[in-house]
Amino acid sequence: MKKLFQFILIIFISSPLFGQSNICSNGKMNNFTKVFEYNKMAYPGDDSFDAAYYKLNLDINYDTRFLIGEVTVSGKSKADNLSSIFLDLQNSFTVDSVIYNNQKLSFTHLSAKLNLSFPNPLSMNDEFSVVVFYKGTPGSSGFGSFEFSRTPTNHPAIWTLSEPYGASDWWPCKDSQADKVDSSDVIVTADESFVTVSNGKLISVTDNGNGTKTYYWKNSYPIAQYLISLAMANYATFSETWNYTDSDTMQVIHYNYPENLTSSRINQLKKTIPMLDVFSELYGLYPFINEKYGHAEFGWGGGMEHQTVSSMGSFGEGIVSHELAHQWFGDKITCADWHNIWLNEGFATYSEALWLEKAYGKNSYDSQINSEMGNPNQWWTAKAASGPLYVQDISSVNSIFNSARSYAKGAVVLHMLRGVLGDEDFFRTLHEYSNHPEFAFKAAVTEDFQSVAESVSNKDLDYFFSEWIYGENYPKYNFSYYINPATSNLEVSISQKSNSNPTFFTMPIKLRIRNSEIDSIYTVFNDQQNQIFEFPEIKSITSVSFDPGNWIMKDLTFVTGIDDENMIPDKFELFQNYPNPFNPTTSIEYTIPSNEYVNLKVYDILGNEVAQLVNEKKDAGNYKVNFDGDKLTSGLYIYKIKAGKFSQVRKMMLLK
């Protein structure tokens, strides 16, 4: 990681608009690569109970790299006759005993699962609490989950980074971010030279009189397991008080390695309070106002949005704003699964641009967005992203923490949604989503965010989310304009090169039209691959600018005239349906370069015909049909087209 981070730093220095969120993404990718090997079978945790409370009481010996733990897990049964549950805990630990109602439970600890058997089965909604006594050397992925390390001046340091599946490397838990506990306590006893930092408020520091101290941190807000953290070193602190209103005040405290707490670092840290002001204005009051915010320096090159205290290896303005924004999007509202990681990382990356806009003006915002869009030769930018924004394979590190997709493209999608909705509805959407009672301090998926955007704007946004979240790539437009000699009206021609999924993009497009009398913005709704828009009121033209505000990620080619033959596809093709997987509807697109009789059918995996979508003669062109699987069961389906001598087959997945 040191070499990787140096490489990233060189790129960042050479390109000042290169978002610092990329530092975050590459570190997380390195972390995930190593922890996933041991944890993939545990995901998504035991769904037979709701976790409600965690209490970690840890005794950590730095010299021997040994941890003795007592962890309380409280929860509620989600089933009748529940006789057993399991917690996630790596096999490197020895479990001494598990206590339930003052008696020892029988247990087994195999394949990173701690299986517990209750003496009497639990009924639906029965509450329980178990205490696990365990010991051993915590797992280390090289950059988390639990690291014994040293500061630049060689003082001992300890830190954790549990995203995505690393919590069970150092404590027993339900390893699923969708099931947040209502509160948590972290109590750590270690050598007296350590200052121990964790989530929430510091309740007490006890000098034990034997060369150790005990720190007690209490978190009173819902929290996901991977956001519970430790950062321990000989910290020096810099703190300020944030006064948002007369009644909304909070301590902002930064824990730094003493040798790094320079005037330059302090100036970087002082950006935090104006950022708190900006994000509270945009998203609602800082979510954990009754506790704290701040940073704890640690030995990893990026940043990690641990709740109420981001762990930081660098302190540039971009990454400070990125990790702070995560307190709303990632911590307050957590993506319910890693398929939807863009709800965390895309939102935080876009918040970097919003901070620049508020602090330095719209030009800074535009420059940042242009940088995030990038080009296909810049691997970290949105145009280089491959595959859907919705992560198909959460076993792939490059899919989850991919800089181009989850970070850059996620941010660009929000920028484009802003263009579709307009500022008023867009910022209302962000605010209402952040404060929605169904999602705030809980977990959400993409459909939840879409529902808020549609409710606020009163617009059907299926087309937008289908193509930008579940589709891939971006539109490549050909554009021309002219005065039609037959009508004397302005006509604007827009065509798109064929894509795979979707075949073409449906988007509202802004046009700036100028002549001697007008200079105005018009919006057209482009929902065909080849489309001509007529403006009967405009008889002369100086120029037409396509998407002058750069609200769409695109490639644009200006052509000087219209050639109708170029609008006819040059080959037969059946495209991948989108979205895919789908529930219950999806779209299937195809092209035919000549007039043909077309037959398009859907079959189940056994070869039984379940639907006939097309059975008629079609003119040459581009077509889209919808398929509704509402009455079908989940599974793999086949769709096949025949057009003249051409035939092609593709697969699609219905998931209910």
Model-derived regions, located:
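Glycine-centered coil/turn sites that cap beta-strands in beta-rich domains
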Residues: 563-578, 582-602, 612, 624-627, ...
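Acidic/His/Gly-enriched intrinsically disordered linker/tail segments
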Residues: 345, 349-412, 416, 420, ...
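Zinc-dependent metallopeptidase catalytic helix centered on the HExxH motif
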Residues: 310-371
